[in-house]
């Protein structure tokens, strides 16, 4: 554990109030050097934990600001160390001045994520809970908030601990049998019972692995590719969905040559919209590169919005059949007839959609420019996302590192099942059980190396 005392601004710039966190063995002593309580005779070191003390930050005889200081004593603090939090006015000058005074009296400026890293190293939380802190800070919807809170409160950790306990019991039975292999009359592990235990563990790990598709969509947004021919109104639709001028709109064909991505929350679900280059035959090298990226993004999307210019719908349907439908297997495709405000005979639009009715493609007619039926399109997107309602009691994997570790653990438990089925020696089975335990422990940070820890915590903000 580090013996130095760290400090950092914990609040965003521009607010009326700012907060500076101080943590480490000398946190209270250093804060006392620059802080004087307003009540005469009172000293910060004598204050009770979890209380606020009003007073002044000073530089020699000069008062810098009126502040409130909260005090936390080890181990009952976020980091598990002695800590103080200085609430001052949000002026950038005041905040920087207080930091300078703290550093001048023995503090060091905290590295990104160092407070949470100290909490992890001090046993206040495991690594998955520490990562949930970053997810909570970055949460942009009710669902991402609920998942982060569940993980931070230890829901995922308890699931992992239960699995590890079962696996440790499993391997102890196997290894005990190995230790007494010379005593043929003794049988410590009934293979049929071990098979049932392995099956139960496999089901839990498999459920966690499968939950990642939902968790990843909730955390990073459901990827929605907006594709179509040039000048069909793709960028206009993106701007309408985002309620801002995110993409350049022009009557010139091929204006969008690169991929544009942005997110929006609809009905509590985050969607990641991907505006792509229009599909057409062209000799323009740069535009062709954009079209190649269009098909790449189409492969990555879960939902595809195929935008068709309703004024010329009949000519665009063949392209849908030959180029788009074969690439949309397993995806949800919504055929969007745009520019309906320019169509004189609306009956031509249903006739066009009838040609793809057998493919279970959903169809809708809109005017992105006039915002006609946009609300209906949004409801179709929410329905197509088909995400379950998430509660704080649900254990859903959202982190790619956790997913990879669980995938390796699942492979190991599959080898255990196979070994038991083939009646292999306990030596081989025990090795795979230990590998499964290793991967589960890696998630909680029990076997994680310093390089991995550094990569995780350096993505936190400095004050966390």
Where are these regions (language model features)?
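A glycine-rich (often HGG/GG-containing) alpha/beta subdomain
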Residues: 1-146, 150, 154, 327, ...
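Conserved nucleotide-binding/hydrolysis micro-motifs of P-loop NTPases
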Residues: 14, 25-27, 73-77, 91-93, ...
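Short, acidic/hydrophobic/Gly-rich beta-strand patch recurrent on exposed beta strands
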Residues: 21, 238, 275
């Amino acid at each position: 554990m580090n013996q130095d005392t760290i400090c950092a601004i914990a609040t965003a710039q521009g607010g009326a109030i700012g907060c500076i966190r101080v943590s480490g063995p000398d946190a209270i002593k250093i804060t006392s050097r620059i802080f004087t309580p307003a009540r005469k005779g009172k000293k910060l070191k004598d204050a009770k934990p979890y209380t606020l003390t009003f007073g002044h930050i000073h530089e020699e005889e000069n008062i810098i600001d009126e502040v409130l200081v909260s005090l936390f004593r080890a181990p009952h603090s976020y980091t598990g160390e002695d800590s103080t939090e200085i609430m001052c006015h949000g002026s950038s000058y005041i905040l920087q001045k207080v930091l300078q005074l703290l550093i001048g009296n023995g503090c060091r400026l905290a590295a990104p994520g160092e407070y949470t890293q100290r909490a992890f190293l001090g046993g206040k939380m495991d690594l998955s809970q520490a990562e949930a802190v970053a997810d909570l800070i970055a949460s942009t919807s009710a669902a991402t908030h609920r998942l982060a809170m569940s993980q931070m409160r230890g829901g995922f950790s308890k699931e992992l601990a239960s699995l590890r306990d079962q696996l440790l019991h499993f391997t102890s039975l196997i290894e005990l049998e190995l230790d007494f292999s010379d005593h043929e009359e003794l049988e410590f592990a009934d293979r049929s019972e071990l098979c049932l235990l392995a099956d139960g563990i496999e089901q839990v790990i498999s459920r966690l692995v499968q939950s990642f598709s939902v968790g990843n969509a909730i955390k990073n947004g459901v990827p929605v590719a907006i594709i179509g021919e040039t000048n069909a109104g793709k960028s206009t639709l993106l701007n309408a969905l985002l309620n801002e001028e995110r993409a350049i709109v022009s009557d010139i064909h091929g204006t969008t040559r690169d991929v544009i991505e942005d997110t929006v929350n609809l009905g509590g679900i985050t969607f990641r919209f991907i505006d792509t280059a229009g599909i057409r035959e062209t000799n323009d090298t740069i535009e062709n590169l954009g079209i190649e990226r269009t098909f790449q993004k189409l492969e990555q999307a879960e939902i595809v919005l195929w935008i068709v210019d309703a004024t010329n719908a009949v000519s665009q349907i063949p392209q849908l059949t030959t180029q788009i439908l074969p690439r949309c297997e397993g995806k949800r495709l919504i055929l969007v007839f745009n520019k309906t405000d320019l169509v004189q005979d609306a009956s031509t639009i249903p006739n066009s959609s009838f040609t793809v009715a057998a493919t279970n493609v959903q169809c809708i007619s809109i005017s992105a420019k006039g915002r006609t039926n946009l609300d209906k399109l949004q409801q179709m997107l929410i329905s197509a996302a088909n995400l379950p309602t998430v509660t704080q009691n649900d254990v859903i994997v959202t982190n790619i590192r956790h997913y990879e570790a669980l995938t390796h653990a699942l492979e190991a438990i599959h080898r255990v099942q196979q070994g038991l089925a083939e009646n292999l020696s306990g030596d081989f089975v025990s090795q795979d059980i230990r590998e499964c335990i290793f991967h589960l422990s890696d998630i909680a940070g029990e076997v994680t190396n310093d390089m991995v820890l550094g990569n995780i915590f350096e993505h936190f903000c400095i004050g966390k």
